[in-house]
């Protein structure tokens, strides 16, 4: 039906007769001439109809936006004054000799000339995806997956599929369950990840595995999460953590070079402890130059409980954040930041405005200065390298609240004041995470998952002091986004059962949920390690959007619903009966 794509026509096509298929993007009727911007997957080209082709001109008068059409015509060079440098096809146009209206379009529910609500865009997604910027994002996604496959193939990885219908295992989020008709009362679970299957593939001797795979997690959503998402899943045998990182870093550098033309260079490596201390986050955005500075040792003896309490508490922390040029912030802005940190559990936000250091106490403005002597204030200014015109914010509480609140404040202030260099790419590896964290109920939970190996600990040492265990785990972070994470896995049955025990999983439950894994660990399991990238998040970064729904063809809302298909929906009672399922409706409160 066509000879060329609209968006691929160039000066080299001048004089050629072409047949194009696509949609009317815009129409301009000048009476004796009609111009349309004709669009397809590859882009837009200008087509015009003149009086010498009367039949085509007459039919063109009926065209409206989003009509699906076929045009045959001759490619012509535009006059110099009419060249459109903003279009890839801007040096040429097509003089139409014939026009076929393949399908007409009703009045559109989306307006291409205005910003449409996200609800409307998702409801009429098939129209939203016609927009060039949306089409380009999905084309970039396709390019990324193609590049990944070629890279992994070139590095000896085998693309192996794993089951979608599997057994529920605790991986941190709720499972999506699928009832079995054959096995009454039993359910499959859709996989949160192929974690155990890819480990079993290493035990089977496949050495290097990868898969671009759908995963499912029934969890609360936010802008960068979906109930179903896509992973670039990787596992290797007989490779150390640094070796895995080296290959995966090479993959990501390859993607950025091919898609963006950017060489990311070598990724710095930072421990979890250092990231939390300096940036208040385990996924620091290194484009932001501000860092947290510990000042607790300077404040232990002050007569100000807000500072002295955390300063003398082993579980407490007092951290300062120097904001270059921040002394210009108004009282209203400071109050807004004070309310902002309360979201993260902070009780307030103390500060020192540094107007003129040479004047001592007279050169600063601070509601807490009366509690601090000149010597302590000077020591704080020295340690934070404060200069005239700077602002110093303080966080004082338990370590987690200080990290969360001050880390979030650092990001917000950096963006608000233009301190974060949005033009840069700042990748890094974060390693040496705590193996466990407090579950809030007196127990421990795995910080990553229960199959991660501890670093330099025996099973006995781990059992004796689990709170001191460091996980042999690593996350890749780019511009403050965790784009991938992985670890060295446990390949010893005793160690695996020890970890299960620490997590409160008794032997009976271990056999019930993980018996197949524990059995497999008895038969010469190789050391193995792996990683998974979030394809959606990688694509989001590479296409420059801050909404993950922009890089998924048919995404869900934050309520895990598809507005287009109206999924989820009620099931037919007959089908439910076949599955031995009865829906119990909660009584409404009167």
From Swiss-Prot:
It catalyses: tRNA(Asp) + L-aspartate + ATP = L-aspartyl-tRNA(Asp) + AMP + diphosphate. Gene3D superfamilies: Bira Bifunctional Protein, Domain 2 (3.30.930.10), GAD-like domain (3.30.1360.30), Nucleic acid-binding proteins (2.40.50.140). ATP binds at residues 217-219, 226, 482, 534-537. One of its GO terms (biological process) is aspartyl-tRNA aminoacylation. Its main location: cytoplasm. The keyword Nucleotidyltransferase does not apply. Its EC number is 6.1.1.12. The keyword Protein biosynthesis applies. Keywords: Aminoacyl-tRNA synthetase, ATP-binding, Cytoplasm, Ligase, Nucleotide-binding, Protein biosynthesis. PROSITE patterns: AA_TRNA_LIGASE_II. InterPro entries: Aa-tRNA-synt_II, aa-tRNA-synth_II, aa-tRNA-synth_II/BPL/LPL, Asp-tRNA-ligase_1, Asp-tRNA-ligase_1_N, Asp/Asn-tRNA-synth_IIb, AspRS_core, GAD-like_sf. Residues 195-198 are annotated as: Aspartate. It is found in: Cytoplasm. One of its GO terms (cellular component) is cytoplasm. One of its GO terms (molecular function) is nucleic acid binding. L-aspartate binds at residues 171, 217, 448, 489. Belongs to the class-II aminoacyl-tRNA synthetase family. Type 1 subfamily. Homodimer. NCBIfam families: aspS_bact, PRK00476.1. Catalyzes the attachment of L-aspartate to tRNA(Asp) in a two-step reaction: L-aspartate is first activated by ATP to form Asp-AMP and then transferred to the acceptor end of tRNA(Asp). This is Aspartate--tRNA ligase. It comes from Shigella sonnei (strain Ss046). The gene is aspS.
